[in-house]
């Protein structure tokens, strides 16, 4: 089995093709392991589709499936073009969501994640039981639960330095309480937003999360008067340009091809 590794905004993914759907959870855990595998944040299985250029199954590094992953959508878009699966502009199916891809330059990829849904507005009082004394999160008056393909809890702090003082145990507790990824952000100015994301499936801070950046962007737009176009900067410091067009969330940034890996034992074990 051949895997192609791509990176988008600091997230890295292994991408391979299959001609039929099956459960690749164990394979994802094996190949995504940082020490005993090739190492990646997730595994993308590219599958044939009757109605789209292709479709995918996406697995987190712990083997759990996810309906959507923003940065992986840009990576698989470039992979599909480079492997003659799809043209520069194409549409693929991620779970039940149509994702459109536009390759503007050799490694600048724009992805349309589609629409979003505001699930809940959560006052600080509902979250205080998860905070330690003098927690940075105590300063967040309101959290926003937003679905951008997967659910995200978003909160904004007033000091950029507080992003470096977040407590992993608190974020993990929030992640399980709301069954969502956790995003803490700082709005530096009208068009620049910094953020940190604690991601489900990774179960830790991640260098970047595309759907998380989309959720932060939407919350900033709806509740903090951010413009329809902004630059978001995650932990990796690799910025993404997000924009809102006709209620669709578009985001654009660099995708890098890292290399190719071969796992011969998969054929022997009949996993493919």
Swiss-Prot record:
Enzyme Commission number(s) of this protein: 5.1.1.7
SUPFAM superfamilies to which the protein is assigned, alphabetical: Diaminopimelate epimerase-like
Reactions accelerated catalytically: (2S,6S)-2,6-diaminopimelate = meso-2,6-diaminopimelate
Pathway involvement of the protein, from the record: Amino-acid biosynthesis; L-lysine biosynthesis via DAP pathway; DL-2,6-diaminopimelate from LL-2,6-diaminopimelate: step 1/1
Transmembrane regions: none
Keyword hit for Mitochondrion: no
Catalytic residues as annotated in Swiss-Prot or TrEMBL: 69 (proton donor), 209 (proton acceptor)
A GO molecular-function descriptor: diaminopimelate epimerase activity
Keywords, sorted A to Z: Amino-acid biosynthesis, Cytoplasm, Isomerase, Lysine biosynthesis
One GO BP: lysine biosynthetic process via diaminopimelate
Record site feature (Could be important to modulate the pK values of the two catalytic cysteine residues), residues: 152, 199
Major localization listed first in the record, in broad terms: cytoplasm
Catalytic EC class: isomerase
InterPro entries in the cross-refs: DAP_epimerase_AS (IPR018510), DAP_epimerase_DapF (IPR001653)
GO cellular component, one term: cytosol
Similarity-based family: Belongs to the diaminopimelate epimerase family.
Known partners and oligomeric status: Homodimer.
Role, per record: Catalyzes the stereoinversion of LL-2,6-diaminopimelate (L,L-DAP) to meso-diaminopimelate (meso-DAP), a precursor of L-lysine and an essential component of the bacterial peptidoglycan.
Name used for this protein in its record: Diaminopimelate epimerase
Lineage of origin: Bacteria, Pseudomonadati, Campylobacterota, Epsilonproteobacteria, Campylobacterales
């Amino acid at each position: 089995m051949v895997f192609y590794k791509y990176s988008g905004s600091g997230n890295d993914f292994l991408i391979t093709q299959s001609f039929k759907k099956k459960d690749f959870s164990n394979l994802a855990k094996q190949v995504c392991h940082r020490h005993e595998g090739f190492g990646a944040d997730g595994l993308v299985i590219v599958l044939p589709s009757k109605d789209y250029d292709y479709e995918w199954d996406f697995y987190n590094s712990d083997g759990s499936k996810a309906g959507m992953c923003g940065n992986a959508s840009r990576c698989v878009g470039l992979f599909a073009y480079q492997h003659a699966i799809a043209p520069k502009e194409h549409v693929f199916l991620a779970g039940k969501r149509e994702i459109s891809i536009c390759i503007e330059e050799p490694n600048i990829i724009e992805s349309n994640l589609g629409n979003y849904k505001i699930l809940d507005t959560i006052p600080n009082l509902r979250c205080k039981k998860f905070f330690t004394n003098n927690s940075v999160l105590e300063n967040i008056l309101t959290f926003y639960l937003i679905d951008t393909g997967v659910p995200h809890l978003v909160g904004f702090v007033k000091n950029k330095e507080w992003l470096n003082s977040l407590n992993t145990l608190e974020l993990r507790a929030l992640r399980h309480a709301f069954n969502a990824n956790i995003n803490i952000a700082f709005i530096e100015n009208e068009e620049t937003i910094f953020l940190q994301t604690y991601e489900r499936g990774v179960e830790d801070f991640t260098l970047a999360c595309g759907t998380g950046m989309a959720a932060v962007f939407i919350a900033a737009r709806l509740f903090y008067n951010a413009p329809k176009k902004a630059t978001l900067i995650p932990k990796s410091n690799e910025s993404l340009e997000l924009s809102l067009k006709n209620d669709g969330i578009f985001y654009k940034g660099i995708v890098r091809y890292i290399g190719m890996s071969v796992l011969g034992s998969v054929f022997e074990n009949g996993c493919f």
